[in-house]
């Protein structure tokens, strides 16, 4: 390996820190949403990763901990689901929150990992085309939504490719870089990808028989992602 490529790998954190799920540090996040008094509510829009984050928080803390948080998500889905169903649910949730308060609503998107899976397409992924399709929809959305919606996009987070070879890290990074650089300026980027690659994560799904499927995270990792987001939207 040349010195130059070695430096590149170090800079882009190609060597992820992986935890044994039993040794991953645990944190408490049950009161984070309640502390965000500047928002009338927080909406996460995503796929199964968002769904399992919701399940983690409900199982660990109960409904009170996420009283201010809504989850608009569908497992196994991506942009086409958002356009045909998810956006409608998100908009009605925004309207509900705005009817009760004059404070802004925070909307955090975390879609993309399923549209970057060759398992879903049967052959190679047009990951550049997928990134452009996301940009087109999200940038239009930024023009349409009222100014009292605060928009955030959470990076597509790492996959353990040893367990899930249908997704490639380089394509995830391209997708993230493309969105981060070209999303409408109303979007604030939440770089949980870099945070997890640097600080560690565990792909261990306690809701699916404790399997490591390479895509879904441990309870501890989900809580750390949630905390990172809550801090990022302050």
Which residues does each PLM region occupy?
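N-terminal low-complexity, Pro/Thr/Ser-rich intrinsically disordered segments
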Residues: 10-40
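Conserved beta-strand segments of alpha/beta enzyme cores
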Residues: 68-70, 150, 186-189
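Short, small-residue-biased leader/transition segments that mark boundaries at the very start
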Residues: 1-8
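Catalytic His-Asp segment of secreted/periplasmic serine-dependent ester chemistry enzymes
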Residues: 159-234
């Amino acid at each position: 390996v040349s010195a130059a490529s070695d430096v590149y790998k170090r800079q882009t954190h190609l060597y992820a820190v992986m935890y044994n799920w039993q040794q991953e540090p645990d944190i408490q996040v049950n009161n984070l949403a309640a502390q965000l008094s500047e928002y009338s509510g927080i909406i996460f829009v995503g796929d199964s990763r968002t769904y399992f984050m919701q399940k983690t928080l409900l199982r660990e803390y109960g409904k009170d901990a996420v009283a201010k948080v809504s989850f608009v998500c569908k497992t196994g889905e991506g942009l086409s689901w958002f356009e045909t169903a998810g956006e409608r649910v998100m908009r009605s949730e925004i309207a509900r929150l705005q009817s009760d308060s004059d404070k802004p609503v925070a909307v955090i998107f975390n879609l993309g990992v399923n549209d970057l899976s060759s398992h879903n397409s049967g052959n190679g992924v047009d990951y550049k085309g997928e990134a452009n399709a996301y940009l087109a929809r999200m940038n239009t959305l930024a023009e349409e939504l009222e100014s009292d919606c605060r928009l955030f996009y959470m990076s597509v987070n790492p996959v353990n490719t040893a367990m899930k070879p249908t997704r490639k890290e380089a394509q995830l990074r391209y997708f993230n870089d493309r969105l981060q650089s070209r999303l409408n300026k109303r979007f604030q980027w939440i770089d949980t990808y870099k945070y997890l690659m640097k600080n560690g994560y565990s792909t261990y799904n306690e809701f699916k028989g404790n399997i490591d499927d390479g895509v879904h995270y441990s309870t501890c990792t989900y809580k750390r992602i949630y905390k990172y987001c809550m801090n990022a939207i302050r």
